[in-house]
């Protein structure tokens, strides 16, 4: 399996996510770019999760149906062809970092998968449901990790 390179001009891998992208700031999605999407992908799937949340992994963003020929998107935009899903805050779209005050540094895993078939998701998918849906269809993936604390 090949690897997708996922990057952001807003923050480096394993570095702090800017406040403007958080729920305390403008709550806008980060600019992202990707390369090395393999041939044969039917779509890309983007997920952002916080595994350090007190109640278990928290869904901050889920976008399916992303055009596999695309290479990224600007800050505050939806990836080309993408369909946004409800996040853990109950809103459709991006929900920026908002860890509990004093809870320490949280990690935000941005995962981009190239999949062989469109995912079958319904309602308000959980992080676990997305991981299960991707399993067996993943052609390649890439991960970018940002951090945030309050």
PLM regions: where:
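N-terminus-centered regions that define maturation/targeting leaders and the start
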Residues: 1-150
């Amino acid at each position: 399996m090949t690897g997708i390179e996922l990057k952001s001009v807003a923050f480096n891998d394993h570095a702090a996510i800017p406040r403007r992208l958080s729920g305390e700031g403008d709550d806008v999605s980060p600019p992202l770019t990707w390369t090395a999407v393999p041939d044969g992908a039917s779509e890309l799937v983007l997920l952002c999760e916080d595994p350090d949340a007190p109640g278990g992994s928290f869904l901050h963003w889920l976008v399916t149906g992303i055009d596999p020929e695309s290479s990224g998107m600007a800050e505050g935009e939806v990836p080309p062809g993408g369909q946004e899903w409800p996040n853990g805050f109950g809103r459709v779209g991006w929900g920026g970092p908002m860890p509990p005050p004093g809870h320490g540094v949280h990690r935000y895993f941005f995962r981009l998968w190239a999949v062989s078939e469109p995912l079958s998701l319904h309602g308000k998918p959980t992080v676990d449901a997305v991981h299960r849906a991707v399993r067996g269809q993943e052609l390649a993936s890439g991960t970018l990790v940002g951090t945030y604390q309050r």
